[in-house]
Amino acid sequence: GSVIDGCNMENASYGLSICAERVALFTAISQGKRPIELAVSCIDAKGDAAPGSRMPCGACRQVMLELLPSKADVSIDGVGRRQLEQLLPTPFELRQPTIN
């Protein structure tokens, strides 16, 4: 397999920042690396940091669910492996309204 790096880019306007998980995922897709079967999230946190502080943010979870298989493994540094669908069991879904 391939290792695709990503880095967190922040600026004064947090809404314009992007997380490393999304950078790596978008880079992999732009390079034609499909299908992607494993995602890895490494958060720079102190050894005694709570597991929740090491988890991918909600935006990254949503993007991963839209671009990866729901059964894909996500390896989270300091936490372990989880299936993607466990990280976001009820994702946002944009569906066309049903017309009766």
Model-derived regions, located:
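C-terminal binding/interaction regions
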Residues: 31-100
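Active-site- and interface-proximal helix/loop "cap" or "latch" segments in soluble metabolic
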Residues: 17, 21, 27-36
